[in-house]
Amino acid sequence: MKTKTLHQSVKLPASPHDVYEALMDSKKHAAFTGAAAKISPKKGGKFSTFDDYATGENLELVPDKKIVQSWRAADWPKGQYSVATFELKPAGKGTQLDFTQTDIPEEVYDDIAQGWVDWYWDKLKAYFK
């Protein structure tokens, strides 16, 4: 299966701590996305977001700085995982979030890329306004 890598960056009007918490706290994640989330805040812990559409495991967690997760969509072939990396850096009064996702199946790349914009970056901007 051919895969692709996605790179996106977004500036958010909140501290790296607040952005990290929104991504890693189940209640805050549900508040900004409007969808159920179960997220373990520990390395090796599992997560499930958007009513089990996206699932995976926390591979590396550096509070307020970095999140690395194995990540898969429910409709991907069994056993197919990507790796999603969120890097958070202070930027003025906000946060620069640099996002990379590797091993995305080529046939769903465009949908996944747009999904991060629609379901994460735009919603985080609105949440922190």
Residue ranges and their predicted role:
Residues 103-129:
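A conserved amphipathic terminal alpha-helix motif
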Residues 7-9, 18, 47, 101, ...:
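Generic anion/oxyanion-binding catalytic loop in active/binding sites
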Residues 14, 76-79, 83, 107, ...:
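Residues at secondary-structure transition points
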Residues 7, 14, 46-50, 111:
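Alpha-helical scaffold segments that form or flank carboxylate-/histidine-based iron centers
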Residues 30, 38, 48, 52-96, ...:
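Hydrophobic-ligand binding "helix-grip"
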Residues 1-38:
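Hydrophobic ligand-binding cavity/cleft-lining segments
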